[in-house]
Curated annotation (Swiss-Prot):
Function: The pyruvate dehydrogenase complex catalyzes the overall conversion of pyruvate to acetyl-CoA and CO(2). It contains multiple copies of three enzymatic components: pyruvate dehydrogenase (E1), dihydrolipoamide acetyltransferase (E2) and lipoamide dehydrogenase (E3).
Quaternary assembly: Heterodimer of an alpha and a beta chain.
Gene this chain is encoded by: pdhA
Cysteine-cysteine disulfides: none
InterPro entries recorded: Alpha-ketoacid_DH_E1_comp, DH_E1, PdhA/BkdA, THDP-binding
Oxidoreductase found in the keyword field: yes
The species this protein was found in: Geobacillus stearothermophilus
Protein name: Pyruvate dehydrogenase E1 component subunit alpha
Amino acid sequence: MGVKTFQFPFAEQLEKVAEQFPTFQILNEEGEVVNEEAMPELSDEQLKELMRRMVYTRILDQRSISLNRQGRLGFYAPTAGQEASQIASHFALEKEDFILPGYRDVPQIIWHGLPLYQAFLFSRGHFHGNQIPEGVNVLPPQIIIGAQYIQAAGVALGLKMRGKKAVAITYTGDGGTSQGDFYEGINFAGAFKAPAIFVVQNNRFAISTPVEKQTVAKTLAQKAVAAGIPGIQVDGMDPLAVYAAVKAARERAINGEGPTLIETLCFRYGPHTMSGDDPTRYRSKELENEWAKKDPLVRFRKFLEAKGLWSEEEENNVIEQAKEEIKEAIKKADETPKQKVTDLISIMFEELPFNLKEQYEIYKEKESK
């Protein structure tokens, strides 16, 4: 007698999940509006300011790479190619919102108020680079991949408990979604309806590991399903799409509707970091050329020029401003006194415990000689 075997619809279930996360786009690669209904309400001046910040950030990246090669900066993770994901997402925030960045997300915290020279000091490992000025709602860049997701969930819950109309936004890359902290963070925020925005900048490679070898999920946005929170996949080279998605997520959050996971499809044009990574060993020239055609600055420039809002002269002005301010910032970083062991001890507590007081005195005597 034959036994009838029930066929569970496993494959169909997965297909249905992935189908719920099509890529959200407003501007195509030619800078043309393909989703008029989703166009955000931004004035002409706001559109120009967004472009200024993206151009400035590209120049900052180029100069930071040069300074690193000269030995004037330490650790640095290039950002070119991710300006729409980073700058347009920040553009949707308010001053009272908190940013919990990863190590590639220094541009967002600079635009949120961290002085540029302190960002350079952070790169050098100077303690003052992590001393955030009063009123600037950012945390120092997180080096441990994914850990910022747990911290963002906690900050967001704190904002909720205090009745603040503000959000905590955090960023990681595609590799970060393979970390346990990622799942703990989105699950915790979902369970407590914490006002958090989780941005996954899917730049296709976790250092050298392609996203296809990190997960069999067809999108990273669908990882939100397990936590029971909304998720969306966005064209991360389209600044208007990124802005619109983050703006909507922020509105949800401050209205008590909980967190959102946003996957931005983007590409880093440079190496993972300046610490010896060679992307030509794991990326083809064809792939790099394909993503170069999607450049967020080129795309947005075409859009603004078609509206008569941007010119070569205006862009050159931003470039010169950026170069001058970077020059001043690195000079200020150079003039900052070198850190001493006593500096590192003294900033740990408001009042030092006895064992650190003892160590402080020992090093103070050594440093005075």
